[in-house]
């Protein structure tokens, strides 16, 4: 309906079913949706990955879902959008060992320099959100500086993680300007340059 809206599809690690039987049923549903709806409007598989912050007890199921959806992305020749929280070692191991065919994106990237370094080595893009604006994000400048501008994307992760000066309020897409401005400030470049480059990066990674 709207030319400028595109979609991604996947099972987030925070939505993994409680049993292996339910997981494979959900995976089959995702595969069916992706294959039926495959078009230029479906631009990635995601967000997929591992989240040990909320629930590490089902880590085996999370890994199974992650790997299966990487296989789906490879089959459909789509990039992946990765969610990784407190699981950087396992996340990197999986994407190294399962040969993701298309580079993807580390979404709402945790401000973890080692994770970012390895992601960049593997060719991934890094997407920054509201946390880089938080006053207690002391390492944000160092992490942003280590990512080349042609590998940066910006997002809000709405309705969560509202950036300063709206922290604590419901987030929405209009707040992405604060993320862009923070990157501009850290890299000492113009807001317009950040907007231009991140737009170009998104068009390239999603092949729009």
Predicted regions and their residues:
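Mid-domain alpha/beta scaffold segments of enzyme catalytic cores
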Residues: 1-208
């Amino acid at each position: 309906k709207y030319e400028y809206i595109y979609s991604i599809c996947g099972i987030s690690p925070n939505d993994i079913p409680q049993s292996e039987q339910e997981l494979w049923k959900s995976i089959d549903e995702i595969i069916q949706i992706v294959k039926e709806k495959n078009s230029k409007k479906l631009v990635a598989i995601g967000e997929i990955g591992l989240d040990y912050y909320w629930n590490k007890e089902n880590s085996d199921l999370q890994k199974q879902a992650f790997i299966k959806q990487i296989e789906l992305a490879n089959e459909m020749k789509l990039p992946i959008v990765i969610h990784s929280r407190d699981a950087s070692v396992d996340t990197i191991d999986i994407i190294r060992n399962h040969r993701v065919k298309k580079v993807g994106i580390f979404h709402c990237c945790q401000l973890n320099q080692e994770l970012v370094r390895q992601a960049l080595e593997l060719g991934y893009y890094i997407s920054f959100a509201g946390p880089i604006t938080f006053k207690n994000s002391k390492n944000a400048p160092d992490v942003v500086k280590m990512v080349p501008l042609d590998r940066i994307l910006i997002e809000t992760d709405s309705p969560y993680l509202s950036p300063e000066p709206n922290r604590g309020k419901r987030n929405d897409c209009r707040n992405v300007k604060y993320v862009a401005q923070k990157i501009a400030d850290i890299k000492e470049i113009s807001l317009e340059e950040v907007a231009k480059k991140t737009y170009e990066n998104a068009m390239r990674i999603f092949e729009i």
